[in-house]
Regions:
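Hydrophobic beta-strand segments within beta-rich accessory/binding domains
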Residues: 36-52, 58, 90-96
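Surface-exposed beta-strand/loop patches in noncatalytic accessory domains
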Residues: 14-19, 24-28, 51-81
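Edge beta-strands of jelly-roll/beta-sandwich modules across compartments, strongly enriched
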Residues: 56-57, 98-111
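Exposed aromatic-hydrophobic patches
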Residues: 33-38, 77-85
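Predominantly extracellular/luminal regions of secreted and cell-surface proteins
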Residues: 2-15
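Short connector loops at helix/strand junctions that flank enzyme active sites
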Residues: 41-43, 53, 76, 87, ...
Length: 113
């Protein structure tokens, strides 16, 4: 979705993905962390909306891989606004404790601060 006259611009959306499923191909055999990357524009702010059936942990990372913000135990809510500063790409990390399972939906949008 494109922003018109400086409004919100959706830059990423994923609905109802499974977290915590058994997976022999990953270390520890459980896919309890999911990462996503997305392009951003400099000097903007992003907001992440989370909806999950059980609480999950959420972090936003810059293009150097450093955590910019972190929120623990979110079931419904938002993280941000988080300034993009000079980044052109950022990432989202969603995690759950080993052995737990969650169905998660995320949406990320960008707007002028």
């Amino acid at each position: 979705m494109m922003a018109v006259f400086g409004g919100k611009e959706q830059i990423f959306k994923m609905e109802r993905f499974a977290l915590g499923e058994f997976d022999r191909s990953v270390d520890g055999f459980y896919k309890n962390v999911q990462t996503f990357s997305f392009g951003v524009k400099k000097k903007r702010a992003i907001t992440v909306k989370i909806s999950a059936d059980v609480p999950v942990d959420v972090a936003v990372a810059n293009e150097k891989g450093s955590s910019v913000t972190y929120k623990q135990s979110i079931k419904e809510g938002t993280v941000g606004p988080v300034p993009t500063e000079d980044n052109r790409e950022m990432g989202l990390i969603v995690g759950i404790y080993k052995g737990d399972k969650a169905t998660v939906s995320v949406e990320v949008w960008m707007e002028r601060p």
